[in-house]
UniProtKB/Swiss-Prot annotation:
Family of the protein in this entry: Belongs to the TrpB family.
Coiled coil: none
Protein name (Swiss-Prot/TrEMBL): Tryptophan synthase beta chain 2
Top-level taxonomy: Archaea, Methanobacteriati, Methanobacteriota, Thermococci, Thermococcales
Record-linked CDD domains: Trp-synth_B
GO molecular function, one term: L-serine hydro-lyase (adding indole, L-tryptophan-forming) activity
Keywords from the named record: Amino-acid biosynthesis, Aromatic amino acid biosynthesis, Lyase, Pyridoxal phosphate, Tryptophan biosynthesis
PANTHER family with a match to the protein in the record: TRYPTOPHAN SYNTHASE, TRYPTOPHAN SYNTHASE-RELATED
Necessary cofactors: pyridoxal 5'-phosphate
Amino acid sequence: MKVVLPDGRIPRRWYNILPDLPEPLDPPLDPETEEPIDIEKLKRIFAEELVKQEISRERYIEIPGELRKLYSKIGRPTPLFRATNLEKLLGTPARIYFKYEGATVTGSHKINTALAQAYYAKKQGIERLVTETGAGQWGTALSLAGALLGLKVRVYMARASYQQKPYRKTLMRIYGAEVFPSPSENTEVGKRFLKEDPNHPGSLGIAISEAIEDVLKDEKARYSLGSVLNHVLMHQTVIGLEAKEQMEEFEEPDVIIGCVGGGSNFAGLAYPFVKDVLDGKSEYEFIAVEPKAAPTMTRGVYTYDYGDSAGLTPKLKMHTLGHRYYVPPIHAGGLRYHGLAPTLSVLINHGIVKPIAYHQTEVFEAAVLFAKAEGIVPAPESAHAVKAVIDKALEARREGKEMVILFNLSGHGLLDLKGYEDYLDGKLEDYEPRDLPVKS
């Protein structure tokens, strides 16, 4: 059972949650002065239109027609499926639906904001985009966006994933991007981390630092970010806006679930539904799932911290493990991040979103079960959501109650098979930090 919308139903506007948050965000701070940052400084890092979107109080922002055509080209609208085989396998009265972002040409949700960021950079006359990537999904998406819009792309890929997922690197290179393992010898930041540990596995925080250092050396370059900031999460709301329309063909969800690293795929599905809760129109349960190896939501502190490991970015008020937190080399590379989207942090603080965490072994076990039932191999990141869905469906079975579950299957795992191989061979290790000193 599935619903596929026609091209003409691609959303015409993104949803911006800022005007609807239960409290306003605290302003980002200048890393040098610790005062609210001058917006003009952000324009040296990001494309100007993205800076405007980041602080906009408009509830809906129009998606340019040219960009909607590109969305169609890469596979939007994406399908929404009912997981009937999984329901039968679990023997649950719950009905399970998933929005499948793996149907895009790059295999994940990341292309939704990659195209938007590249589009606005091109309009401004920017020639080169530089970014970080964890598992490689974001780097792949920006590489294709650059190819489609005529921009050069350079990607700093967390070294653990660079080694675990060599074909992601190959795919980025096919699309024309330069790819460096991070930490690298390409930047002063990278050299410093390599001096501390020549075999450093890297992290999203370190890769962000390298990308920003790179950008600041080139006036014609700008930084593109794959998660965390509001404009990135806003671009992803095409997922939830489509899903709301598709679920009208089925039924109203009770529970909405997504995995979380920085927060973009969770927000993409959930925020259009969160609006209904904030407006008092509906009651949904929102579950955000993270790895126990990077327990930002479940064990982090809500405070100002840098978005990168070297302290080059503005400080954001968010849930954080501390920007120098050593993130273990789990296979869900896209979730190896110390911080969290400020907007999602606020929703967690107000009890609107419930966070939970799992070990990677139990996550891969759930992913294999899902693959056997539905035929789709989830990305290791998305598999965290699958684990939560299965647990919720089993809860419904124990309590003998009907329940409608909607989750975001944010990407496929066909280029992440080393993690699955390690799981099947009994080689996966679980990581959970004992102490989490946060130094902002």
